[in-house]
């Protein structure tokens, strides 16, 4: 049986471009993705290039706190 905290946790990735701009004026919203990460293999914050439907391009999505 596993002891201690769960190794795999659910994290939320948020578009860093939308956050910096203060959200687009035409379409209100910030692009977010939900994924999992392994705490032992990746203790640092995740960053992926994903498509942002509000910016209409591929941008860096970084992990945020819950």
From Swiss-Prot:
Keywords for the protein's UniProt record, in alphabetical order: Chloroplast, Plastid, Ribonucleoprotein, Ribosomal protein
Record bears the keyword Chloroplast: yes
GO CC entries: chloroplast; ribonucleoprotein complex; ribosome
SUPFAM superfamilies, per the entry: Zn-binding ribosomal proteins
Subcellular location: Plastid, Chloroplast
Domain of life: Eukaryota
GO biological process, one term: translation
GO MF, one example: structural constituent of ribosome
Location (main, coarse): plastid
Stored HAMAP family: Ribosomal_bL33
Family: Belongs to the bacterial ribosomal protein bL33 family.
PANTHER family xrefs: 50S RIBOSOMAL PROTEIN L33, CHLOROPLASTIC (PTHR43168), LARGE RIBOSOMAL SUBUNIT PROTEIN BL33C (PTHR43168:SF2)
Protein name, as recorded: Large ribosomal subunit protein bL33c
Organism name: Phalaenopsis aphrodite subsp. formosana
């Amino acid at each position: 049986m596993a002891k201690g905290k769960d190794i795999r946790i659910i994290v939320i990735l948020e578009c860093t471009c939308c956050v910096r701009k203060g959200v687009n004026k035409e379409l209100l919203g910030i692009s977010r993705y939900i994924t999992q990460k392994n705490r032992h293999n990746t203790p640092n914050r995740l960053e992926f290039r994903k498509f942002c439907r509000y910016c209409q391009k591929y941008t860096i999505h970084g992990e945020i706190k819950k």
